[in-house]
Amino acid sequence: MATKFPKFSQDLAQDPTTRRIWYGIATAHDFETHDGMTEENLYQKIFASHFGHLAIIFLWTSGTLFHVAWQGNFEQWIKDPLNVRPIAHAIWDPHFGQGAIDAFTQAGASNPVNIAYSGVYHWFYTIGMTTNADLYQGAVFLLILSSLFLFAGWLHLQPKFRPSLAWFKDAESRLNHHLAGLFGVSSLAWTGHLVHVAIPESRGVHVGWDNFLSVKPHPAGLMPFFTGNWGVYAQNPDTAGHVFGTSQGAGTAILTFLGGFHPQTESLWLTDIAHHHLAIAVLFIIAGHMYRTKFGIGHSIKEILNAHQPPSGKLGAGHKGLYDTVNNSLHFQLGLALASLGVITSLVAQHMYSLPSYAFIAKDYTTQAALYTHHQYIAGFLMVGAFAHGAIFFVRDYDPEANKDNVLYRMLEHKEALISHLSWVSLFLGFHTLGLYVHNDVVVAFGTPEKQILIEPVFAQFVQAASGKALYGFDVLLSNADSIASNASAAYLPGWLDAINSGSNSLFLNIGPGDFLVHHAIALGLHTTTLILVKGALDARGSKLMPDKKDFGYSFPCDGPGRGGTCDISAWDAFYLAMFWMLNTLGWLTFYWHWKHLGIWQGNVAQFNENSTYLMGWFRDYLWANSAQLINGYNPYGVNNLSVWAWMFLFGHLVWATGFMFLISWRGYWQELIETIVWAHERTPLANIVRWKDKPVALSIVQARLVGLAHFTVGYVLTYAAFLIASTSGKFG
């Protein structure tokens, strides 16, 4: 007899109901719980899957390069990046009538195409690609790399090539290799690419496989490097009149500290970027030689952590026991990795628009909006995931004895203080921010807008002034030419001050009362999300109601007071609730960013400044006013090139609303409905010929919440993505 799904759990495979299928899918990646799983096998499986993951990333990027080269207009775009719209790929759709074919035949193409809003054209151009042949070569290279990684993944699952558990637990060696190899050497290699290929290409000098060994990146060659005269590499930078991609106004410097932006491309100077990556390479290569391996030299992390005990004794055992706790818990490691990656992804969103590094991307407004929103959403998901795995760590991996009186133990001991302070901050922010918005709404509605409570963000303006912004007249630090800070920063300051005080970029935007209010609304969202996540993680293992939940697991439902009241203590439910708050916060954040920038890009900053201080302003002048083109994507008179976004806007709402069907209903209702349908099916001629082996049962509470949340999330993202892209591209192309 064929074994039933899931093969990894005999217990589930023998379940006579449809629960078998859903629980099988839900636990497919929970390797720890699979039958016969050993710790060594667990590590080996996860290790091998990393190669598969990387293979997919390389394949995906290869596909992007290939489609741009095959169906895009890269070579035409390079000639006029500010006016030619980049093509992502062609569209072949049997549903298209003549109207749609005409509407989507755009950007100089002879057939329907999609416009690229990912910024890849700007990236390809900045790093030295100038022809379709370059793109094809990149695609083939990544395809080969992808195959190699797939093979490596398979190879590391073979008995002969499976690393041992001891190899996985050797944290110091792994850290050295990852610091020096992954970050250090790859940053050095990227510096090499920028210096040898990208910078010459930006100056009109072609460097390819045919001549890369004979073209010197700098006229002085390696002599200054070996003689210690490194300053030569910073002399004669590109001038302010440099035309990107040509020798006009080009210099010879390769590693500079100019500060600010290239006047024509409005992106960071490539020579500054190369210098930055070289500095990172040096730092990380040194860092990768710090830790003790089998050679017995260097620091032992375990010794360092165990020695971290405050001499006063007031903070207990300090970091004692943490090395083994972290090293033996994959969930702890994953939580740390997700938190770090979440923060860095949010920083990427922030810096991609404020300090754009790719040529001409600052003037591709739809791409800027899409990239900011994309990276902030990803950051949100990663951060929630960090806390989810932190909670699973407490349930599955935390050993109170091994962590007696250390910082982890003490965090749990005073968790009430942490949770209550977060609660207080959330309540304070919520009531005061909403109070101000609602007050302003009421007085505007009654025709007395002058009675609004408008608060200038003076502290934030002071911080901007300290960084060099002259507008507010604070005359402090970098905005004061005679200050210590200004004298110390003389090398890069002229370029930086030009950039920060220019009205044409997004670096340190002018802020007022509308920004003050929405900043606090976003702070409310962040603190409430954090409150739910921190409480969920700290109460995951035990709370007043259930002192130790180790055997109860992570994903049990919050079931209300009727069945024992587990809402206080379900870590899964905290994660579930936090997802809604995270999405809510991202809504406020991206609305703010987009509306503020629409005003700047259209030369009408007053629209945001005057209407963002009360709620109706947000609903009417941001959401409603900007969805006009979207709702008109197709109408009785025909179709335009926003129709796909108009359709997605509708479809996104539908998916989002479907989520509530799963979220606001009783499980018993579904069970009755299912049994009624089964009863009718079994008594209907012809239909009753078809039978199934599993007895249909309603989804469990946790499953229904997950399905509801998935619909809510996907619908929410689809709806806003369509709105963002259509409302921006409808105005600026």
Swiss-Prot record:
GO terms for biological process: photosynthesis. PsaA and PsaB bind P700, the primary electron donor of photosystem I (PSI), as well as the electron acceptors A0, A1 and FX. PSI is a plastocyanin/cytochrome c6-ferredoxin oxidoreductase, converting photonic excitation into a charge separation, which transfers an electron from the donor P700 chlorophyll pair to the spectroscopically characterized acceptors A0, A1, FX, FA and FB in turn. Oxidized P700 is reduced on the lumenal side of the thylakoid membrane by plastocyanin or cytochrome c6. The PsaA/B heterodimer binds the P700 chlorophyll special pair and subsequent electron acceptors. PSI consists of a core antenna complex that captures photons, and an electron transfer chain that converts photonic excitation into a charge separation. The cyanobacterial PSI reaction center is composed of one copy each of PsaA,B,C,D,E,F,I,J,K,L,M and X, and forms trimeric complexes. [4Fe-4S] cluster binds at residues 558, 567. It holds the Pfam family PsaA_PsaB. Keywords: 4Fe-4S, Chlorophyll, Chromophore, Electron transport, Iron, Iron-sulfur, Magnesium, Membrane, Metal-binding, Oxidoreductase, Photosynthesis, Photosystem I, Thylakoid, Transmembrane, Transmembrane helix, Transport. It catalyses: reduced [plastocyanin] + hnu + oxidized [2Fe-2S]-[ferredoxin] = oxidized [plastocyanin] + reduced [2Fe-2S]-[ferredoxin]. This is Photosystem I P700 chlorophyll a apoprotein A2. Its EC number is 1.97.1.12. It is a multi-pass membrane protein. SUPFAM superfamilies: Photosystem I subunits PsaA/PsaB (SSF81558). NCBIfam families: psaB. The gene is psaB. The chain crosses the membrane at residues 46-69, 135-158, 175-199, 273-291, 330-353, 369-395, 417-439, 516-534, 574-595, 642-664, 706-726. Its main location: membrane. Belongs to the PsaA/PsaB family. Chlorophyll a B3 binds at residues 661, 669. GO terms for molecular function: 4 iron, 4 sulfur cluster binding; chlorophyll binding; electron transfer activity; magnesium ion binding; oxidoreductase activity. PSI electron transfer chain: 5 chlorophyll a, 1 chlorophyll a', 2 phylloquinones and 3 4Fe-4S clusters. PSI core antenna: 90 chlorophyll a, 22 carotenoids, 3 phospholipids and 1 galactolipid. P700 is a chlorophyll a/chlorophyll a' dimer, A0 is one or more chlorophyll a, A1 is one or both phylloquinones and FX is a shared 4Fe-4S iron-sulfur center. It comes from Picosynechococcus sp. (strain ATCC 27264 / PCC 7002 / PR-6) (Agmenellum quadruplicatum). Chlorophyll a B1 binds at residue 653.
